[in-house]
């Protein structure tokens, strides 16, 4: 039974709490009444009596119970009559509490809710003090703050009254702890009277009135400490750099500092002009950690900036006595002030100040020591790094190659192009090779010309040679070319061996027209020799033709076919021979009946004969005749007609 009762109490408490959180306990549909003496809001520490009266139907309650913040009260409950009960609190000190009462009806397993109340205790407001109104630079608002005094614990409102001393117009602004008033709403006057009224359920208090001139309450833009450094001079000093975006020219500032282990601040005062860089010098203890803060105000005014954020700096580890003589510079306007005790207008605690020298820099003073140290450091660094990079370049071949490639890409090509060396020329190496390089490029065929025949000798038929000698030579030559012996016979014609890579080319012939191309020596009569002499007299110069590398090896030797010996000796002719030969040159191109028609000379070698003259260990290219065979035959027939 006790367990069930506890669950019922928890449910009722949760229900009351839920209802109180959503609109207050007074929104409960009460089955009776509940009131507080002296009231629902009362001064903290007073004695309080809370009454509960039931008005339930069909219920004669056995007991009435009180709950505070969900917990059942057991003491100081008095049953006044059958329907009313009271609970008494001595020196109630809780700021907020919610109370409800229940009734125990016969025949019900749970208590019945009667009613509930939300009660509060607090203090009447104190008169606002230290009323201050300022205009932060660039904000566009007048900000008024004050000291509210001790907490009231109950809802307290603060009303700011702003009254113009020129127009007598008064404006009121509702606030809690501070207020921001737009300067646009204060255009009617420059002088105002400001005070604050604090009001709550327990009382009302007014602050002292404040006379305000809008031009005198402007605070410069916030100051910020950017960095600090300790120099390594003979007497080490710490330079603190700070800045502000204020447009006010005349500003008075304070900078306070202390070690992190000390509770006493040392304050340094100086005039500042934020048109220039702000630097403050301090002679501090070595190897110590210091905290710096700065604040400023317009010169001659009473309102200060709030202290800037703490800036921590660690001094160097150098030790030694320091001379407290201030450092002077032609670029610096220096002021010193001795203050035994500082009582800031916005601060209530006295602060100890030491005798310090304030140094304000105008511009950027040049530091000769810093420049010398930087130059010396740079020279030492360069002297060390140059040998290191040189050694790396010497021993790292890939790095050298990479650097060389990048340099060659950046400089003009003509600066590093080598003069061709003929000893290492690819052309010279190609001529020295014994292998044949085929060239199928038809565009290069037109560049080949016939070489000059420097000498043509004819063996007289009167000279008798042994038959064995002729047959042996001819047989050996033909057998080496893998050609049938019966296919060749002696001839008195000039034999041209074409370049196998380029096909046929027009050549000169001395064969009598209409005669047999291959005439046996035994069948030739002496009369034919005379005509032959005349025919050879016409051949003084010969067209130039060019041989490939493979053909040169073959043509550098003397080729003797029967009585005719064609000797090709390169380099044995001179300019005089060429000139004489040009004067005596007779064209081998035969003239037709029409003087304007020119018939070119043709090759007299058949395809079978040319194939026999090729080198045996080479792959023969396709024989590309310059003229079809039927064209050659037609030319041969026409030549025969001309001779007749």
From Swiss-Prot:
What InterPro entries does this protein map onto? FN3_dom, FN3_sf, Ig-like_fold, Type1_Cytokine_Rcpt_Type2
Give membrane topology per the record. Single-pass type I membrane protein
Q: Which GO terms describe its biological process?
A: cell surface receptor signaling pathway via JAK-STAT; cytokine-mediated signaling pathway; inflammatory response; leukocyte mediated immunity; negative regulation of interleukin-10 production; positive regulation of defense response to virus by host; positive regulation of interleukin-12 production; positive regulation of T-helper 1 type immune response
Compartments, record wording:
Cell membrane
Where does the Fibronectin type-III domain start and stop, copy by copy? 127-217, 219-318
| Keywords attached to this entry | Cell membrane, Glycoprotein, Immunity, Inflammatory response, Innate immunity, Membrane, Phosphoprotein, Receptor, Repeat, Signal, Transmembrane, Transmembrane helix
Tell me what PTMs the record reports for this protein. Answer: Phosphorylated in response to IL23.
Q: In which tissues is it expressed?
A: Expressed by Th1, Th2 and dendritic cells.
Positions of transmembrane segments: 375-395
Keyword Cell membrane among UniProt keywords: yes
Where, in residue ranges, is this chain on the Extracellular side? Answer: 24-374
Q: Does the keyword Methyltransferase apply?
A: no
> Would you indicate the residue range of the signal peptide?
1-23
> Subunit comment for this entry?
Heterodimer with IL12RB1. In presence of IL23, the heterodimer forms the IL23 receptor. Interacts with JAK2 and in presence of IL23 with STAT3.
Free-text function comment from the UniProt entry: Associates with IL12RB1 to form the interleukin-23 receptor. Binds IL23 and mediates T-cells, NK cells and possibly certain macrophage/myeloid cells stimulation probably through activation of the Jak-Stat signaling cascade. IL23 functions in innate and adaptive immunity and may participate in acute response to infection in peripheral tissues. IL23 may be responsible for autoimmune inflammatory diseases and be important for tumorigenesis.
The identity of this protein, by name, is Interleukin-23 receptor
Q: Which organism was this protein described from?
A: Mus musculus (Mouse)
Organism phylogeny: Eukaryota, Metazoa, Chordata, Craniata, Vertebrata
Gene symbol here is: Il23r
